[in-house]
Regions:
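Membrane-proximal basic amphipathic "stem/tether" segments
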Residues: 1-56, 232
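Catalytic binding pocket for nucleotide-activated donors in carbohydrate/polymer assembly enzymes
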Residues: 285-287, 316-392
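Active-site and donor-binding regions of nucleotide-sugar-utilizing enzymes
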Residues: 51-205
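Conserved catalytic-core segment of nucleotide-activated headgroup transferases in glycan assembly
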Residues: 63-69, 200-284, 361
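A short, gly/pro- and small-residue-rich
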Residues: 133-153, 233-247, 328-339
Length: 414
């Protein structure tokens, strides 16, 4: 017991290093919400109500969270009060409000719902009214059974921050069979705290139609050049983003004559949509081509881009697996592979080269050549890729949200 307390104190001390003013404000709002939470908990017990609180990033509703929220609100016989937490200034707010009950992210009522809910369900690890305060609270036994992790993307790497000892998730939901086996074996989750149920957003993928004139370029972020945040233990101050290899490689791609001519000759559009952690640098990118769109996340919905596009170019992003789920071709442009493995994510079970779920390139020319090949072959994946695809996604249907719902019902009170 004593050793457990020492370990907990060390983890809390580590988190305190990343505290911001907003965290202290969050702690203040939490204290204010305690008495209303006690009153509200008595009320919902008298009314025999159960509350499920759902969120993603505080300003978004485009991921597994909103898909699961939509599913729950479509059930006629569901006796659960569901709330979606989102910033009222979010461009997605009005759409969420049409679906069901909304609560302002970080508000007193958000805290009340968080404390009184049966489950707090999120696609984000820090899906709480305040990440730092929630981290401490969920180390307490009374709060430990609440957090349901829908995930933002399929886990591919050896991500220590997702280990059970670090997360204490009540349920870790996996989107693929190999992912489930890897996380279960290596991340320390008890058997009933991890399940292969599929992602809610997958439900719409099987019925989507290709928009054959569109390619999506969707690179991930880089921890060593992104802003310091609660995810980051490695941070390199980059005073001029345009000096980074990341910027120069993608700027080179966006202005490649070879790519521009390929797009123009085939009447294609390429949408450049970098990871949200890199979106703040979006204005530094430019292109001379009218066939290339530099996409702001405020104006473009990532799920729609995935469903409409015919080819994806990414680097290490797990969003490629969404594309693979739809049996669409993926190119992994990995110009900084060695540094990425050293500074960001250690290699896990997923081998980009041998997986059969895409083609790895390291140079600009190879990337464009592979893209050209996919265009010439009608955007079809190879027979080998199709076989490996079926192995990776041993369950492929539109029942993912239903499975999640049924599983949550089965673990109530456990």
């Amino acid at each position: 017991m004593y050793e457990w307390r020492i370990t907990l104190l060390k983890k809390i001390k580590h988190e305190l290093n990343y505290l911001k003013l907003s965290n202290f404000i969050g702690a203040f709002i939490f204290v204010i919400s305690l008495i209303p939470s006690i009153v509200y908990s008595i009320y919902i017990k008298l009314k025999d109500k159960k509350i499920w609180l759902i969120c993603e990033d505080k300003s978004e509703a485009r991921d597994n969270g909103i898909c699961f929220f939509s599913y729950l609100n479509s059930l006629r016989d569901c006796n659960i009060d569901t709330y979606y937490a989102i910033d009222y200034n979010s461009p997605d707010y009005s759409e969420v409000n049409k679906i069901g009950k909304v609560v302002r992210y970080g508000s007193v009522f958000h805290w009340v719902l968080y404390l009184c809910s049966e489950f707090n369900i999120s696609s984000q690890k820090n899906g709480r009214p305040d990440a730092a305060v929630g981290y401490v609270l969920e180390r307490l036994p009374i709060m430990r059974k609440k957090f349901i992790f829908l995930q933002h993307g399929i886990t591919l790497s050896y991500a220590k921050w997702l280990f059970y000892n670090n997360s204490k998730f009540r349920l870790f939901i996996c989107g693929a069979k190999p992912e489930y086996e890897y996380v279960k074996e290596n991340f320390g989750y008890p058997d009933d705290h991890i399940a292969y149920l599929g992602f809610s957003r997958f439900d719409a993928y099987l019925s989507c139609k290709k928009k054959t004139s569109q390619i999506v370029l969707m690179p991930s972020w880089r921890e060593w050049i992104s802003s310091k945040n609660e995810f980051s233990n490695i941070y390199e101050d980059t005073s001029d983003f345009t000096n980074t290899q990341y910027y120069n490689k993608y700027q080179e791609l966006l202005n490649s004559d070879k790519l521009i001519n390929l797009l123009k000759n085939n009447n294609l559009t390429l949408v450049f949509y970098p990871h949200r952690n890199m979106q703040k640098y979006l204005k530094t990118f430019s292109t001379t081509s009218s066939n290339i769109i530099i996409a702001d996340k405020e104006q473009y919905n990532i799920r729609k881009l995935l469903m409409e596009s015919s080819v994806m170019i990414t680097d290490y992003s797990s969003v490629a697996l969404d594309f693979a789920y739809m049996k669409k071709p993926v190119i992994y442009y990995q110009f900084d592979e060695a540094r990425f493995r050293e500074a960001q994510y250690q290699k896990g079970y997923f081998d980009y080269r041998s997986s059969g779920l895409g083609v790895v390139t390291n140079t600009l020319d190879d990337t464009i050549n592979i893209l050209h090949r996919y265009i010439n072959y009608g955007y079809n994946i190879s027979g080998y890729s199709s076989v490996e695809n079926e192995k990776f996604f041993s369950v492929r249907d539109d029942k993912n949200s239903e499975r999640i719902y049924e599983y949550l019902l089965s673990i109530r009170g456990k």
